[in-house]
Amino acid sequence: MEELNELEKAILSKLSVKYPAIQEHMPFLRVLNREITGVGMYVNFCYVKDPQVSIPCLEISDGCISTNENIEIQGLKYGIGYEVDVSDGKIKFIEFITYGEEWDGVIKDYRFI
């Protein structure tokens, strides 16, 4: 398990504007794995437990949430889109998708547009 990278944290921070409880989940999220699909990537999460802290359930219906922004990434002409999957009150994964371009999952410079 590893810490979230800068982009993953930025996405969750942006979503926390509409869904503030996400901020309470972020300290406990770790990356379980990153699955490269060739035209996208899944970043699967798990939670680390702290017996002293109770993480509130996200009051978000099961499904996917997004800010509907695109992300410009160095090396991709059309950038990427993303959705965050929420199930059972927890953040399960981020799905990144390209718009038909091959992608190795490497994130160098990026910006939200």
Question: What are the language-model segments listed below?
Answer:
Residues 73-113:
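Short, compact, well-ordered microdomains
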Residues 1-64, 70, 106-113:
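N-terminal domain-onset segments
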